[in-house]
Amino acid sequence: MTPEHLPTEQYEAQLAEKVVRLQSMMAPFSDLVPEVFRSPVSHYRMRAEFRIWHDGDDLYHIIFDQQTKSRIRVDSFPAASELINQLMTAMIAGVRNNPILRHKLFQIDYLTTLRNQAVVSLLYHKKLDDEWRQQAEALRDALRAQNLNVHLIGRATKTKIALDQDYIDERLPIAGKEMIYRQVENSFTQPNAAMNIQMLEWALDVTKGSKGDLLELYCGNGNFSLALARNFDRVLATEIAKPSVAAAQYNIAANHIDNVQIIRMAAEEFTQAMNGVREFNRLQGIDLKSYQCETIFVDPPRSGLDSETEKMVQAYPRILYISCNPETLCKNLETLSQTHKVERLALFDQFPYTHHMECGVLLTAK
């Protein structure tokens, strides 16, 4: 695979290899055949980041080869949304001959939605001033004249200039209901929107008929919490990043959801609070003991769950675990399988043509 060519004819073979690999990794814990969720074969990534290479009068997007570290010119990127591909061409054309916009530009980040909204961030090794803003506004207007629904942002050290706004609102059809998700630039969002829809619908399916409340750690912008709220009496969710918490609060209101409470704290701190190890001012007015959480949902970073959180989640009758790294999932399962058994197993092909696998497991207490 090269950045400008996807081996779409190999899609089925690479997916089959992942299924075999996941089954092999999960064999010590389950003999289930994974439920398999396919990605679109191209244009599946809703966000992408590129370094910008200056070559005389020319400049272009590049990425670095992960093995050799050599740079690779990228003029089109079929893994990314069609809108990102349009914007890549339009941004280079708009910046190339503009000395103010191109000077010390070193990176461009793209974030798009299924409804063709975009936020494009230009990153600089220089101070941004009013002259930069004027030129950026002219570029934005020129892009919009091409029917590109785009918001531009300039970034430099300790500086962020959003010409209009620094977010876009994604709308996803989830099990017969449209969900609105505010996505803020430079914050985590699920990169593959089609796969995100399938993950959310799978999570809804495996939690059908749930009793009591749901606890979620690492909730981000509320991606899972809000979709799952319809299956539970109440949802209590934690997140540490301020922009994500703000987006989650917006999403709660935008979706008219009244049974989700977001707390800004790390999973490790929340574990301490739940265990009564220490008190937190941020929890004033929230009666943790009033929640009857029968299910806990975790979607941890690649490092997986730390040992304290492992112990904490074992206290819950049901654990729903979405993993972006099956190796750390299996490491966690060495502990979790002492008290819980795997009831459902899913493979989500988040990043086709790569080694990467995303998977989901539902665990129930033995």
Curated annotation (Swiss-Prot):
Sites where the protein binds S-adenosyl-L-methionine: Q190, Y218, N223, E239, D299
Pfam families with a match to the protein in the record: tRNA_U5-meth_tr
Residue positions of the active site: C324, E358
The UniProt record lists the keyword ATP-binding: no
Xref: SUPFAM superfamilies: S-adenosyl-L-methionine-dependent methyltransferases (SSF53335)
GO molecular function, one term: tRNA binding
Reaction(s) this enzyme catalyzes, per UniProt: uridine(54) in tRNA + S-adenosyl-L-methionine = 5-methyluridine(54) in tRNA + S-adenosyl-L-homocysteine + H(+); uridine(341) in tmRNA + S-adenosyl-L-methionine = 5-methyluridine(341) in tmRNA + S-adenosyl-L-homocysteine + H(+)
Any one of the GO CC terms: cytosol
Known EC number: 2.1.1.-, 2.1.1.35
UniProt keyword annotation of tRNA processing present: yes
One GO process term, biological-process aspect: tRNA methylation
PROSITE patterns in alphabetical order: SAM_MT_RNA_M5U, TRMA_1, TRMA_2
Its job: Dual-specificity methyltransferase that catalyzes the formation of 5-methyluridine at position 54 (m5U54) in all tRNAs, and that of position 341 (m5U341) in tmRNA (transfer-mRNA).
PANTHER family, A to Z: TRNA/TMRNA (URACIL-C(5))-METHYLTRANSFERASE, TRNA_TMRNA (URACIL-C(5))-METHYLTRANSFERASE
Name of the protein in its database record: tRNA/tmRNA (uracil-C(5))-methyltransferase
Gene (UniProt): trmA
